[in-house]
Amino acid sequence: MGVPSRGRLLLGLTPYCLAAGSFLLAALAAVRAEAAEVLPAAAAAGDKQAAAEAGPQDERQSPGDYPDDVDASAMTARINDLVREGWQAQGVRPSRQATDAEWCRRVYLDLAGRIPTVAELDSFTQRRSRLKRAELVDSLLGEEYAADYTRNWKTIWTNILIGRTGGTDRQSLTSREGMMDYLEASFAANKPYDALVRELVTATGDARPDMENYNGAVNFLIEKLDEGGVQAAAKTAQIFLGMSVQCTQCHNHPFNEHRQNQFWELNAFFRQTGVDRAMMDEDEDYDYATLVDRDFAGEGKMAGDARDSVFLEQVDGQLVDRDAAGVFSAPIFYELRNGQVQVAFPAFVDGTTLAERFAEQGAEFGNSGRLSQVNRRQELAKLLVDSPSLETAAVNRMWAHFFGYGFTKPIDDIGSHNPASHPELLAELAKAFRACGFDMRQLMRWIVLSDPYALSSTAAEGNEDDDPALGRAPLFSRFYVRQMQPEQLYESLLVATQADAKLKEAERDEMKTRWLGQFNTALGNDEGTESTVFNGSIPQALMMMNGDLVERACRTDAGGFLDKVANNAELSNREKINYLYRAALSRLPGKDETNICNELLAARYGDVVQTLQDVWWAVLNSNEFILVH
């Protein structure tokens, strides 16, 4: 009868659900059942010698005992204390500590964007140092893993700043390559977060790396300046201040303190900014785009037109504004719901106006649109980096990266209307982040060496209700299971399977772009948002099970991953199966899984290559593989 078809095997695998119990056991059982149907005699008789060789293994290593004083960081200790206070206040008992292998897989995914190799896993778990977790974190944040670290974090921040679809369209002004190159250099240099924000908000220059005046930082804003820079204002507030203000361009927010005038006063900072672009005649693709600063005369008026006592006049051959007192001014206008037109000048979200700041220095042109008098984006950058909201939003976002949930939900809507789950901890972490010079690696280190991050994802008696997915405020009494991001999954598949080993660089890039593109859906709305659809649906299950990458990973070609494992004379059949589990899941198979593998090996008449292929396919398509846990 031959090898069971993937289509027939899928019949036993349709309950593909990321939150299901042991999908892996179900997958292995389906493979075993199919093999038994094809080879009933062998399944009944078995290969006793092979089954005995693949004897049962311990399901988990014993959790290590890491005393509280392993990490000397005062902030890590403070995290532990304040989170523990929350447990005590709610009468919650935390889960056990994660095993070394569990923690190792977790921290590799979060810091390096991929699972560890078998060699890396063994190196860590076999180390006897009581400081080995801190030592591994230092390695992941240091030169040894610089390539993985920068690839991971440039990807994360490219997606934050321009989305997963930003710069992928042929007619896009954004250069995705330029954005990623800029962020790669920034994370490689451990650029302070405030400096990063300042550069992103004030950048001028060409978007593409091959242009003369290239400045990759311009790609954050270059496609957000249409319609008067509405998206520039909204995304700046959302990403860097943790403020969701998009809807206030039309009206006061119905559920929080954000007001319509605040949105347009923030928007006024971007009115001196423009985009120069050139279009290729042949296919109407944009050849280049350049972000520039230019004088802003004021919005929507002609010479002699009066609104709110603001007039345009000729100065040095240009139309500029003077108010009734003769001071230069360049206003913008917005409309209330009742149709009344209002004027807006640059003012920060805390109410600080440029006119007031300049007046304190004896200057009267804070509302001017002339670059020779004021550069509004430069002034906005100063206000941003001076604002305590900057570090608060950054810490909240970083915490959510490592725990799956921030102190607020959503993470970019912070305020009195949306109280933080741990306000004291958020405030202290934010203060410390500023005090350490906005050192992002330091912030990461505090978090990943904390007690909450080291907990098991398995609920304990008494903390079953600590589940933010049910709408409850997180207590962080266990590690919350979450899906890998598509980029993490892709890199982890490559690490586990070496599926790209024989590809050229151009082929690797094409395969990655095509694979990741399956998960992205742009949402057509005025917020410029998109969705990364990776939810365990049947189409995605089919893509994983039958896609090119998994198919390539499961080949038994000479010199391939499975061929090397199957023909490794130094490994027993048991050790070969163990190797597959460690390569994908960073653990050994449990007793039930081992029994199924034994039965499958018997059903295959001891055909190790075919058995390994079936087991490998099931492991890669398991919910456990695609989860951070």
Predicted features along the sequence, with ranges:
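Short, structured secondary-structure elements
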Residues: 56-298, 302, 391-430, 440, ...
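Alpha-helical support elements that line or immediately flank enzyme active sites
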Residues: 386, 429-434
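N-terminal secretory signal peptides that target proteins for export/translocation
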Residues: 1-12
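Carboxylate/His-rich catalytic cores and anion/metal-binding grooves
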Residues: 193-195, 333, 377
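Bacterial N-terminal signal peptides
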Residues: 12-29
